[in-house]
């Protein structure tokens, strides 16, 4: 049975892909270039992860997305927001930073294209790494969004491909724990090849350590009691 993994190269999508691999599925992966700052590093990470899990990897360029986005992820003149560790669970602050990196209808666009790719390769499932931590502020990272999108797929695809997000109830800490167990089960070290940073840093897999995504990654490994293999600038 085939599955397509929506792969940003980040921690969540990497663990999600490992889960699909552990289920014995034939894997395809799809990564999107929509003009985001870290796209080069995301593609490098996604290619490496795809190699590790034996997935057929495809990169899709979507240059038009940045043309109607004022997000700090796609506009270099906009400053990427930072957040203190003590503010990560502050809903008001997290919502404020979310709005600065929000790309209009991003998941709607990416998931729609992933659905077309899945139908083309006759995949039964699409795996994506939605999680409860990001779902607290990003409306397109929620269980409700997932369920409603699946309802659309029943009418929008002939093979009625279904989107799965096995991590949507888990926090980043729990995702790290799941990832570590999967490394042991699959005998593949993959967590160190994931890339979470919002920035395009000088070397592959080097993280800034100060953007919100890096801060959540740091905290997740620390709280999970798992050694963090990530190299941070700060």
UniProtKB/Swiss-Prot annotation:
EC number(s) from the headed UniProt entry: 6.3.4.20
Organism, as annotated: Methanococcus aeolicus (strain ATCC BAA-1280 / DSM 17508 / OCM 812 / Nankai-3)
Protein name: 7-cyano-7-deazaguanine synthase
Gene Ontology molecular function: ATP binding; ligase activity, forming carbon-nitrogen bonds; zinc ion binding
Family: Belongs to the QueC family.
UniProt catalytic activity: 7-carboxy-7-deazaguanine + NH4(+) + ATP = 7-cyano-7-deazaguanine + ADP + phosphate + H2O + H(+)
Record-listed ATP binding positions: 7-17
Pathways per UniProt: Purine metabolism; 7-cyano-7-deazaguanine biosynthesis
Disulfide bridge partners, by residue number: none
Keywords noted in UniProt: ATP-binding, Ligase, Metal-binding, Nucleotide-binding, Zinc
Coiled-coil intervals, chain numbering: none
Needed cofactors: Zn(2+)
Cofactor note: Binds 1 zinc ion per subunit.
Enzyme class per UniProt: ligase
Function per UniProt: Catalyzes the ATP-dependent conversion of 7-carboxy-7-deazaguanine (CDG) to 7-cyano-7-deazaguanine (preQ(0)).
Binding positions (Zn(2+)): 197, 208, 211, 214
Keyword match Electron transport: no
Keyword Transport: no
